[in-house]
Amino acid sequence: MAGAAGLAASGAVQTASAQESKSEELKTNAKKGGKRVAIVFDADLGIGPHLARRFAKMNYNLVITSPADGLTEELKELGSDVVVVPGFQQDGPNSEAQVGGAKRVVNAAMDKFGGFDSAFARTALHTVADILHETAEGLHKSYEQNCLAVMYSLQAFLPPLMEAGRGQIVIQTSATSEKPNPGLVAYCTFRAAAAIMVRCAALTAAPKGICVNAVGTNFMNYPGFLHTLGADTDPKKLQAILEEIPMGRLGEEDEAAHFCAALLDGQNMYTTGNFFPVAGGFNNAGMHTV
C-alpha cells in the first residue's frame, strides 16, 4: 500500500507539475499588446500566409515580411495587430540571406510588442542541376539562401527567446533534406545542412526551454514548385511527379501550415530537435513490407 500511495502521490505531483507547465507555456513573452506574438518570416509564398491566418485566428499579434496581396488587411480583420517589416522580397534575389535581415524582423517585434513567442522562417532558392552540371556559382547561391539564411534566422530568433525562457521556432526546409533529388544537388545539399543546423540549435536552446524544429515540405501545390520541375506546362511531368508520391496527390499549403502551427502554438513544448518531412509519404517510399 505504501508503494501504491507513493506512486499515487508521485502521479499527483507530476499531474500538478504538468498543469503548471501548461499554464506557463500559454503566457507571453510580449510586454506590450496583451497577446502572444508570432513572427512569420515570409508571408508571401507557400506555408507563410496560411500560417499567419492560423495565428490570427488563435488571437496572436503578428510580425510579418513580404505579405501576400490583401493578407495584412485580412489579418487585421481577424483581430491581430500586424507589423509588416519592409525590404524583403521572394522573387529573387531573396532577402533572408542578407546580413542583419532576420535581426530587423526581431527588432520590429521587440520594438512594437516587447517580445515574441513563436517564429517561423522559410528560406528557399531552387537551383536545378545534377552533380555533373552544377556550377560553383549555383552552389554558392544555394548555400547563401538555403543554409546561411537559416543561420542568420536562428541567430536572430534564439537570443530573445532564450533570455525569456520560453518560445518555439520552426524553420521550413525541404523533404529533400532527407531524401535527395539528384537533379537538385546544390539545393538538397544545403537543405540537409540546414536541417542539421536546426538540430544543433535545438540542443543549444533546450536547456532554456526553447523548442526548435525543422519541417521539410515537398510536392506542395503552389505555382513555384510546379514551375521548378516544369510540371506547370507539361501534364506528363505532373503525372510522373504524382506517381512518386505514395498518397498520389500534391499537398495543400494549409495542410502543412496546420502541422507547423502545432509546433508553434505554445502548448507543444516537449518536442524539439526534429526534422519532420511533410511530403505525402515520399520520404518512406520504397520501404516496402513483406
Which functions belong to the PLM regions below?
Residues 25-63:
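Canonical Rossmann dinucleotide-binding motif of NAD(H)/NADP(H)-dependent dehydrogenases/reductases
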Residues 90-103, 111, 118, 124-140, ...:
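Conserved mid-core segment of classical short-chain dehydrogenase/reductases
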Residues 125, 132-151, 170, 194, ...:
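Catalytic Tyr-X3-Lys loop
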Residues 154-155, 199:
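A short, exposed helix-loop element centered on a Lys and neighboring polar residues
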Residues 159, 203-204, 269:
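Alpha-helical segment proximal to the catalytic Tyr-Lys
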Residues 168-193, 198-207, 219-220:
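Catalytic loop of short-chain dehydrogenase/reductase
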Residues 206, 211, 271-273:
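Short, small/polar-rich loop/turn modules that mediate ligand/substrate recognition or access, typified
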Residues 272-290:
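Short C-terminal tail/terminal secondary-structure segment
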